[in-house]
Structure formats: structure tokens, C-alpha cells
Amino acid sequence: MQLNASEISSFIKDKIADYDNKVENKAEGTIVNVSDGIVQIQGLSQAMLGEMIELPNGNFALAMNLERDSVGAVVLGAYEHLREGDKVHCTGRILEVPVGRGLLGRVVDALGNPIDGKGKIDAEGSSPVEKIAPGVIERQSVDQPLQTGLKAIDSMVPLGRGQRELIIGDRQTGKTAIAIDAIINQKNTGVICIYVAIGQKASSIASVVRKLEEADALKHTIVVAASASTSAAMQYIAPYSGCAMGEFFRDRGEDALIIYDDLTKQAWAYRQVSLLLRRPPGREAYPGDVFYLHSRLLERAARINAKEVERLTAGKVKGKTGSLTALPIIETQAGDVSAFVPTNVISITDGQIFLETDLFNSGIRPAINAGLSVSRVGGAAQTQIIKKLGGGIRLALAQYRELAAFAQFASDLDEATRKQLEHGQRVTELMKQKQYAPLSVAEMAISLFAADKGYLDTVAVEDIMAYETALLSFMRENHADLMNTINTTGKYDEAVQTGLKEALDAFVEKRSL
């Protein structure tokens, strides 16, 4: 074959012209050990804490231990295929999850991947799972109510938008039920809800999703599921992922509610990861930074002022504040609130709703202990009519519990004590509420008005719930305008007071016929 010199010259020139002199500098390391979802990597001296490390199959690991000659990373996903000697690379990125309205009505895993079989998610962007909480200057005081629809909570331990209120109690005391009722009650309020399920049975999560669908509440809710079958790393990350999704709405001048169900299991998952990484154990074998684990998460729930919203949206949203309200759940063992994780979370949050097994088993549901439950900032945000009418409820219940214990030993009681006991029994009965049946502000106000003004004093204790149902039905049929006024304004003026008195007098008269 005859080679032409000019052809060879042209070929070489073309190759030189096409040559790209770009050098790609990639930090590469080698896996030296794989066990229980943890990889030890050598040669990644440039790795940063919390950085994503690319694994051979396209999966990622999270760098959590930076040692002198190796990096300890936790694998996000399957790790069975990883072998000693596999090459890994630094990415220079931190973990991000998809955010936006496209997530509403969907069930996703801790990384934001859909697991509900409804196809791809149309996200508006992505956000880092770890973010610094808003500073003091960016915050605004809590002064807007967040109604749960539960009489016992909205009257005694009111919640405000931007608050952190702990729900604490033993297993099977109705903690999740309170959270689900709160989500259902936000249906037409414009509040976006995020439900983060951590370490729960997949069947329990499916049951919650089905209940939200039945109540038509899934369309304003994002469910982040890290079930008991997922890795400890996923259970540890899930709350931060859910928080990032909620912050998207908060930073755009909207209101969001996030429920962490529950943070005890997240602490267990973090303890497991920390022990596998050979971190030194402390009290109850938790690592030294378990307080920071929860404080950096819960401090991100806040109400931010209009100026900060305007800055975050580059001037697109003006004159609106944004809020992220958190309802973390903690499971106690045999009512022990002095354990490590419960005391940590109690000290971080703005109050707690304490649920008792004894109350639950005696049929008082929601099983809220009025004496131990408190809302430190919600009082400033409480609706006026509920604040005025519900003021005596907590006192009546606290006095009743005290007197009931004393009355067990007393043979004869004076008239005043007997009346107080009877009033307490009726109030206790009135505070009972069926699951998945949240009440509006007006319905709540009517029930509290009846208790406050003595309308229940002539009703037998066992008939209180039936009396309340009949009363609310009567009000909906005959006094819808008054109820609309209460729901719209939330005020307790003379006109509302007169209207309620006339309505209840008419109901009593009708009932006596």
C-alpha cells in the first residue's frame, strides 16, 4: 500500500487540532474495608466532612469520619457489591434532595426518590439536606395560630406557626394519631405538611398514607419514609431531608408543618452508625454529639420575617413571612422522661404534649396529661375566642386530678369540693375526641362555651359526648352564619357572646321538649 506524505501530514494535523489538552484532576481512593454499610477508604486526603463520595456502581457514600490516614463513610443504599480494592472518587458536593410543589401528594425515600409507583417527580430544584438555621435577626416572633383541631391541645397547649412542640409518651399512647389529625386539619388552610416516618413498619406507613388519602389530605402533604427495613444511614438522614423540603415553602413566604415520627428511632440509627464508625460511646452508648444531632434539626423550624423572605426570593415575594412548624415525636420507655434523648429534645423545643398510658387505657383520648404538658410560646398565637373560653379548662382539669386523688381517702366531701369534682369529670369527658375528626375553631368554641357557662352541669357525665354531637349538629343547621363569623374572625366580642348564649338557650329548650 502506497502512503502519500501529504495525507499522513494532514491526518496528523487533524489529530493535533482535535486534541483536547484538558486535564481532569480527580481525587481517587481505595476501599480497604467494607462492613455493615460502612466503608473505610484510603487515599482520599482531600475529602471533606459530609461530602458525597462516588462508589463504583454509581451509588454514593457520606464521609463522616476524617482520620489521619483513612476516611470512614456510610453507604447510602446497597453495599453488598462493594469489595476491598475498589476505586472511589471525591465529588466536591454535599448531599442534596429534590424540593418543590411536585413532591406534594407523593411518598419518597430519604434521598427524595419516589417509592409510591406514581412515576417521576417534577421537582423545582434541589436543596442541601444540612443547612444552617435562620439567625436571630432573620426570625420573627410566633404570633399566628396553628390549629390542630383537637380541643385538648388548642385550648390548653396551643401551637403557633414557627413553633417546635414535642409530642412525648410511651408506645401505643396515640402520638401518631395527634400528628395525623393535625395534618388533616390543615386541609383548607394553605399549610403544607411533611410527614417523616423513621424506623416504622412499612405497613404502618402505608396505613398513614391511606388514611391521609381517605381524608383528602394527601394532596397538601409530602411523606418521607425511612422504614425499619432501610439502612441506619437512611433513617439518620430522613429528618434532614424532610426539613429541606419544608424549608423550600418557608423561604417563599408560605407556612409548613413537619412531623418527625419519631426522633427516638433516628437517635438509635445515629448511635448504630457512630458505633460502627468506632466513635467513642458516651451516656447510654450514644455518641457525644447526639444533642447537636437534634438541635441543628429543630432549630431550622422557625418563623422568618418578610425582609428575609424577600431576600431569599430575590424580591419576588414581598410583605409575607414564612414559617416551618415542627412536631417532633419521642417515644419513652415506661414513662421515663428523664432518659438522655427525651431530656435533650425537651430542652430544645418550645413545649411538650405529654401522653400517659394510664389515661389512654382509661378511655381518655387524646391521653394528654394537662399538668405536665405546656406550650411556651403558643399562648401569644392562640385564637382570641379559644383563649378566653379555654382559660379555665387547664385549671379545672388540674384541680380535678388533685381532688380525685384526695377524694379516694375522704369519706364525706363538702358541697364545693363535690361540685368541683363533678365539673372536672365533665370537662375531662368533653376533652375526649374521636380520631380523624378534628374540629373547626367555631365547633371548639361552642363546646368550650357550653362548659364555661355551666350548660353541661345538668348533663350526666356519660351523656356528654352525645350532648356535644347533638349541640354541634344543631348549630350547623340553625346558626351557620354565627359559626362562619367565629371561623373567620376568631374574636370573642359581645355580639358573638350574645349569639352563642341565645343559640345554646334555644338548644336546651328544644332538648327539654
From Swiss-Prot:
EC number: 7.1.2.2
Molecular function in Gene Ontology: ADP binding; ATP binding; proton-transporting ATP synthase activity, rotational mechanism
Gene3D superfamilies associated with the record: 2.40.30.20, ATP synthase alpha/beta chain, C-terminal domain, P-loop containing nucleotide triphosphate hydrolases
Residues holding ATP: G169, D170, R171, Q172, T173, G174, K175, T176
Site annotation Required for activity: residues: S373
First-level EC class: translocase
SUPFAM superfamilies reported in the protein's UniProt record: C-terminal domain of alpha and beta subunits of F1 ATP synthase (SSF47917), N-terminal domain of alpha and beta subunits of F1 ATP synthase (SSF50615), P-loop containing nucleoside triphosphate hydrolases (SSF52540)
Subcellular location: Cell inner membrane
Cellular component terms per the entry's GO annotation: plasma membrane; proton-transporting ATP synthase complex
HAMAP family the UniProt entry points to: ATP_synth_alpha_bact
Function in brief: Produces ATP from ADP in the presence of a proton gradient across the membrane. The alpha chain is a regulatory subunit.
The protein, known as: ATP synthase subunit alpha
